[in-house]
Amino acid sequence: MPQITRSIELFEKAKKFIPGGVNSPVRAFKSVGGTPIYMAKGSGAYMTDVDGNTYLDYVGSWGPFILGSMHPRITAALEYTLKNIGTSFGTPIEMEIEIAELLCQIVPSLEMVRMVNSGTEATMSAVRLARGYTGRDKIIKFEGCYHGHGDSFLIKAGSGALTLGAPDSPGVTKGTAQDTLNATYNDIESVKLLVQENKGNVAAIIIEPVAGNTGVIPAQPGFLAALRQLCDEEGIVLIFDEVMCGFRVALGGAQSLYGVTPDLTTMGKIIGGGLPVGAFGGKRKLMERVAPLGDVYQAGTLSGNPLALTAGLETLKILMDENPYPELERKAVILEEGFKANLAKLGLNYVQNRVGSMSCLFFTETPVVNYTTAITADTKKHAKYFHSLLDQGIYTAPSQFEAMFISSVMTDEDLDKTIKANYNALVASQQ
């Protein structure tokens, strides 16, 4: 077990000034117990904590670090921007046009795009746009999917809300809750029923095409296409939330992987290269309703700031130049097969779900295809598993219901180390 004296000291101090001692709930280790680890530095595939312990990083800042931490090209680009351009102006800059054009080239659904400062801003804005465009109030989301902490989304939500065992939040008004309808992921009939019960009143269906905040749950064959058809028939705006899976499962996101094009797409994480960023975009006829061109208001003081755009642009250029996706897939298969072999050796039948370089090991024998099946996982066994990995220098998400991310800079030696640690952690989970 690593020495974490300084982390303990810092957490106790943090709790005096910061609610729960953290600025995002999942970081508090509530579902796994123990003290959150305070990091001091990241480099490549590794992080070092304030006590000098080093960890192989499978959280990757919750997804953005597909290229690892402190990539030399991104670091150099940021340094140049800091020294020669500036941090923010509150005016248009040329870089905004460059990243917008690049995003429209890469992502199938994008004809126009608006930069914002977070994934939450992106999803809130996309839903507002859908309501403004259709003149309707209700939206359909899916149980366990997480679309940020906007009020409309904190109803049967995933990610940190699910981690804390509270997928709903006080402070969400009854009116908001009534306008948010929840369907079952991978169940098109549940969606059709809600649409029929609310005929002519549904503005949008928003979905993670790879649900990454209830563990990892891929859309089953035909499900997204059926949603597309239903939305076309009913005049509903289809929104893909690709904040997590965008540029992760494929350069063009899950929509390019599955061949289904939404009306609007929300993005974040990877397109910020580790800095705060978000974006939403889609069909021109919808995006032309966004202010100042149209009547649907959206604004942001720091939207499109040079630092975030620099990191995002350089990340996208590296992904296009180097095409790490085949190698990421190879590494992901190595881990998946290694974990599968370990489970077999121990006579365990736990479920592994994976799409590209994001995956989740569920501590359940029930196939995980939606929220209901995901929560059959044994969180107590997962907690033991997590701490065993941590003790072995492997940092994974401190929640059963979050994804494990591979970065392009991980070596085969790193993977071998992880597979060995996985075996030991599985043993520990059963004790």
Curated annotation (Swiss-Prot):
It is an enzyme of class 5 (isomerase). GO terms for cellular component: cytoplasm. Its EC number is 5.4.3.8. PROSITE patterns: AA_TRANSFER_CLASS_3. CDD domains: OAT_like. One of its GO terms (molecular function) is transaminase activity. It is found in: Cytoplasm. GO terms for biological process: chlorophyll biosynthetic process; protoporphyrinogen IX biosynthetic process. Keywords: Chlorophyll biosynthesis, Cytoplasm, Isomerase, Porphyrin biosynthesis, Pyridoxal phosphate. The keyword Cell inner membrane does not apply. The modification N6-(pyridoxal phosphate)lysine is found at residue 269. Pathway: Porphyrin-containing compound metabolism; protoporphyrin-IX biosynthesis; 5-aminolevulinate from L-glutamyl-tRNA(Glu): step 2/2; Porphyrin-containing compound metabolism; chlorophyll biosynthesis. It catalyses: (S)-4-amino-5-oxopentanoate = 5-aminolevulinate. Its cofactor is pyridoxal 5'-phosphate. Belongs to the class-III pyridoxal-phosphate-dependent aminotransferase family. HemL subfamily. Homodimer. This is Glutamate-1-semialdehyde 2,1-aminomutase. It comes from Chlorobium chlorochromatii (strain CaD3). The lineage of its organism: Bacteria, Pseudomonadati, Chlorobiota, Chlorobiia, Chlorobiales.
